[in-house]
């Protein structure tokens, strides 16, 4: 997977990371917290679309959001997530929903190659039913429902490391290392910053179980 564009000028301060509209009198939005990072909650709606907002709640919490106020109203053991498959490495799938990256695990993929070869590939739009356990998401069921309209997508992610020609993103404690165009090296000052980047959906890193060539130059890392 190649990083097509990095936009460091869009590094997001944590205080500005709430993307849910804050208009007065806004309708209440209800959903389930599926991830959190740096004071930002990722909340999936009943239709599976993930939204980001500032607040405090445990992963798995059922929340009601009105404006910028987040209230915990219960707890869920399962949730629905709809998004685009970005990459698979081992038993981890990286999914982009509404530009937000999620790391979803599936230990069942260790059982054999038949499962991994038939799994939806990068660029596929999927609806995934996940269980929530100790802050992690475990895939229970996955249905491919379409394909992305573009060969690249924009995502928001936190930079955990930079290397010569690579950048490593932190996705709920899992790392995703991708190539930079033309051997570009980013400044170390971006580490810990949340940035908006454009990722190619070409699955060419050579480090997963989807038939990639091991000769491909890729900053392989755990996704």
Give the label of every model feature segment:
Residues 2-223:
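Short, flexible, surface-exposed loop segments at domain boundaries
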């Amino acid at each position: 997977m190649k990083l097509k564009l990095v936009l460091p000028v869009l590094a997001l301060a944590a205080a500005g990371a709430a993307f849910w509209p804050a208009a007065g009198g806004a309708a209440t939005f209800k959903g389930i917290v599926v991830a959190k990072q740096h004071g930002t909650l990722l909340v999936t709606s009943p239709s599976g679309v993930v939204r980001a907002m500032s607040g405090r709640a445990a992963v798995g919490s059922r929340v009601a959001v009105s404006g910028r106020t987040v209230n915990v109203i219960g707890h869920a053991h399962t949730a629905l997530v709809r998004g685009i498959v970005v990459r698979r490495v081992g038993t981890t799938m990286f999914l982009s929903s509404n530009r937000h990256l999620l790391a979803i695990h599936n230990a069942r993929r260790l059982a054999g190659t038949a499962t991994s070869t038939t799994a939806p590939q990068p660029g596929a739009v999927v609806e995934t039913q996940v269980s929530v356990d100790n802050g992690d998401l475990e895939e229970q069921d996955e249905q491919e429902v379409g394909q992305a309209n573009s060969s690249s997508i924009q995502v928001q992610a936190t930079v955990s490391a930079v290397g010569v020609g690579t950048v490593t993103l932190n996705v709920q404690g899992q790392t995703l290392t991708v190539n930079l165009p033309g051997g570009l090296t980013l400044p170390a000052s971006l580490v810990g910053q949340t940035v908006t980047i454009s990722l190619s959906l070409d699955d060419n890193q050579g480090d997963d179980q989807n038939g990639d060539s091991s000769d491909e130059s890729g900053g392989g890392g755990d996704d």
